[in-house]
């Protein structure tokens, strides 16, 4: 038996007190009074941590109560199906008999909506700042100032990008590591097309990398898909669509991505 279970060991050897159940019942009954007293008397950091814990407990309690109510509540629909014929415009409506079925249908729709925007690579390995940036030392006489950083990963900058003056440029994006096109694969059509990159939408490493336009594995980019001839349900041509980078661009020398459809 583990060393920390000495109470259980004692109870197995000698049994419990005769008033064990009564003491347990009273201790549980006092819990609400103890919680109320702590909520009123605690101060400072302990109060913040206590309120955060109670807030999470109340959320879970409300969820359990709501789930219980949905399981029990019945709708006002009749128990037996009606024999009178329905008009044509009402035939497509489902005859849900309880609230749980309606709730389940709503949850399924939400899950489908979430799956619509699921990505091929949900998790990627983190990249440290030492790997991402190279320190560039500056200074006229002594190279002691090291506030500049050179980005060692591929980047994307727009056509209207202009470098800042050298004196004020903190992040340097080398010309040899700038990419304008990506090899995008359509998962349903099974074709790979080289499409121009419009913008970097989300870099999973950091919001700063998104702002700098760094292209790493798992980054969401927007590409120009007008060449594919995709159209919406309304008949309009789709111009920009999102894609996720699936390779390490700095090793392969190109950007490979999968279109999010």
UniProtKB/Swiss-Prot annotation:
Disulfide topology: none
Motif Nuclear localization signal 2: which ranges? 51-58
> Where in the cell does this protein reside?
Nucleus, Nucleolus
Q: Which organism is it from?
A: Coccidioides immitis (strain RS) (Valley fever fungus)
- Residue ranges, compositional bias (Basic and acidic residues): 1-36
Alphabetic keyword roster: Nucleus, Ribonucleoprotein, Ribosome biogenesis, rRNA processing
Q: Which gene encodes it?
A: NSA2
UniProt lists the family membership as follows: Belongs to the eukaryotic ribosomal protein eS8 family. Ribosome biogenesis protein NSA2 subfamily.
Q: What does this protein do?
A: Involved in the biogenesis of the 60S ribosomal subunit. May play a part in the quality control of pre-60S particles.
Give the chief site where it resides.
Answer: nucleus
Biased composition of type Basic residues is found at: 45-65
Name it: Ribosome biogenesis protein NSA2
Residue ranges of the region described as Disordered: 1-87
Record's subunit section: Component of the pre-66S ribosomal particle. Interacts with NOP7 and RRP1. Interacts with RSA4 (via WD repeats).
What's an example GO BP annotation here? rRNA processing
Q: Is Metal-binding set as a keyword in this record?
A: no
**Cellular component terms, GO, for this chain's entry?**
nucleolus; ribonucleoprotein complex
